[in-house]
Structure formats: structure tokens, C-alpha cells
Amino acid sequence: MDPVIEDVLAANRAFYDAHESRDLDAMRSVWEHSQRTVCVHPGWPILRTWPIIEESWRRILEGPGRNQFILTNEAVAIDGDIAWVTLDENLVDAGGTGTVAATNLYARSDDTWLLVAHHGSPVISR
């Protein structure tokens, strides 16, 4: 596998590891702290800028329940210093299971890929 793709997938895995472990510091480390960051949690309105996104993650990670992610259907595309990962987040929690279709956009800063946009949409059964 291309080492750049491996780096992007490692950054993406770090995002989900931070979520699963409910580690706000780890979540902070995977995001770019800028005005251009955007996040859409399933069922939430669009959140813009790092301070607002950080507060949303604090609320989620300190809230009740735990999520385990089984990531499937991953695809990576890279164009210069921008990369995006599309995937299915298969969630397992105390309430059952569900799938969220997600897109994560990363920007390379030096040799680090930082998350600049996350969008998750629930998959409705047909």
C-alpha cells in the first residue's frame, strides 16, 4: 500500500480511537485548530470553527454511553495536501447497532494529517 495512504488511514484510525476511548485530548490532537474546520454529527446542525467543534466533542465524550466502531467500505483519495476518507461507521452500543455514512477530510501540515471536516449521516434501512 502507498505509504501516504497508510498515513491518512492512521490519522483516520486515531480519530475513531479517540472517540471510542472517550479521550478529549486525543480528539484535540487529530483536529486542525482553525476557523476552517467543519463538523456534522449525525442529527446535528453544521458546526464551524474549532472552538465550537471542540465543545461538541466534550459534550459527546463526557456524555452517557460508549460506542464501538467497526469501520467498513473505506476509500481514500488524495490530492496534494488534501485527503478524504469515505467509509461506513458501523456503531455498536448498548442500544444496538446502526450505520453512519461518513466523510472525513484531512489537510497535511508538515508530515501530519489533521482533520478539517467530518460529516456523518445515518443510513436509513431500505
Predicted regions and their residues:
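A beta-strand edge to alpha-helix "cap/lid" segment located at domain peripheries
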Residues: 1-32, 36-126
